[in-house]
């Protein structure tokens, strides 16, 4: 068994890569099961969406503002994009729960099974959807509150002068970003809490996450940011760069590589989940002496 111990950011990222490498087949299968539907939906939608937007893009390019009637053909596609985003968002929570089972079994020295991962993900879907909806509502309220606050601040400072108003607006944006990041980092491990702790409901998961991240929100922020850059942004840049380079050499091959880039979340998403799950273990170890016996009991492993 691998000991659960306090970890620094580098150890969390290294541990996530190690666990992923050991179970790459399982993570890939789980990613395909969870995300293939939404990603295929987006792949089929991208062609018609692009073709419908091209006339509008041409008008915008030459400096003309399209009329409302010209935008109307885009509305059905925008509705489908919203539907796809909702499906992807919910599917990502199923993937997260299943991936946590694989990660936890790896820590316990057991051989992870795809069936166990799917079973845990399916059993947690209803409360995880609740968490997902609560996070969307929270982000929406934060966005509305921050916008209102910035507008009011800029308006008041505008009575002094335009320069002061601009400075106040900039300070407001910085403050709003900090506040939103602070709140979301506080609720950064709600999915892990709901999946890996017994008897915790949706709202209890938010309270529990806030308690675990107390005085550790900066670590949550850096873990999420760095893992997002390393496991998402850099792979996308590399793949899209290769696709662009191949376009000049072999356009069909370039298009194939570009199309495959849409399926990168199948590979990348489990890495993000692994990093955040190891962060959750780290937070519990530091606060509660979390160990393998507790994890084993939670998963029902003898």
Model-predicted regions and their roles:
Residues 53-72:
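Perimembrane loop-to-helix junctions flanking transmembrane segments
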């Amino acid at each position: 068994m691998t000991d659960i111990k306090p970890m620094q950011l580098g150890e969390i990222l290294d541990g996530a890569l190690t666990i992923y490498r050991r179970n790459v087949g399982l993570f890939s299968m789980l990613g395909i099961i969870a995300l293939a539907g939404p990603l295929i939906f987006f792949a089929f939608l991208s062609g018609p969406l692009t073709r419908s937007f091209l006339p509008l893009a041409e008008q915008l390019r030459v400096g003309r503002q399209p009329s409302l009637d010209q935008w109307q053909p885009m509305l059905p596609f925008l509705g489908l994009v919203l539907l796809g985003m909702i499906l992807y968002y919910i599917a990502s929570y199923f993937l997260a729960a299943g991936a946590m089972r694989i990660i936890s079994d790896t820590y316990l020295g057991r051989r992870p099974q795809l069936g166990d991962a799917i079973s845990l993900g399916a059993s947690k879907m209803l409360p995880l959807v609740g968490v997902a909806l609560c996070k969307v509502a929270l982000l929406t309220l934060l966005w509305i509150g921050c916008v209102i606050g910035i507008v009011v601040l800029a308006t008041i400072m505008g009575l002094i002068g335009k320069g002061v108003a601009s400075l106040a607006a900039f300070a407001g944006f910085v403050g709003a970003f900090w506040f939103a990041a602070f709140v979301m980092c506080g609720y950064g491990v709600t999915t892990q809490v709901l999946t890996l702790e017994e008897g915790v409901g949706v709202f209890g998961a938010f309270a529990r996450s806030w308690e675990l991240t107390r005085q550790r929100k900066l670590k949550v922020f850096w873990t999420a940011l760095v893992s997002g850059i390393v496991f998402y942004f850099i792979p996308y840049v590399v793949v899209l760069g290769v696709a662009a380079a191949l376009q000049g050499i072999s356009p069909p091959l370039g298009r194939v590589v570009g199309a495959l880039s849409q399926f990168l979340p199948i590979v990348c998403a489990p890495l993000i989940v692994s990093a955040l799950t190891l962060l959750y273990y780290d937070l519990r170890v530091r606060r509660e002496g979390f160990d393998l016996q507790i994890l084993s009991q939670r998963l029902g492993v003898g």
